């Protein structure tokens, strides 16, 4: 079964979808899809596709309108649920005029790094890309401006909810550049360490071509 060029428009955002479904037996079910959400809230993305919460758990702390793309192949169980460890694919998330709040990690880091607003962070623009494989999401480097800071971020989000992220403060009120490494078993149990920045300026590697090539090869 193959579905192509399917789209829908609603008051919660626009959705487009391409996909296929193939089965050799009840225990061997495969699917592939490219789903794109435009001008939609993070809450609705997770509601429509709960697997996104596993791929990028911090997304539920973002408020505002997002554009999201998830292209992947996966195995399905007999109830037609995604078998998370089998997912291989790419993800893209972009958005403007976003807020991150109701997030324990943000509040702790905002306090330690002397943010002006320690309750919520305003993000003028965000563009995140990553590759999903072997039960991990590799988040490629991206630039994000928040409060008085310009940050370069990258990391690994494991599908068991553990993670390892790095944040380089390439522009800040401090007289020297800092790096912050954040690791944890989940977003309730984590720790951070201040050290050297991995990225020195906003001229970070761009991996969009890798994302596009991976998407074509799915």
Which role fits each region the language model picked out?
Residues 132-148, 152-154, 158-160:
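Extended serine/threonine-enriched, polar tracts that run as long, contiguous segments within proteins
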Residues 1-6, 10-125, 132, 154-218:
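Membrane-proximal interfacial segments on either side of biological membranes
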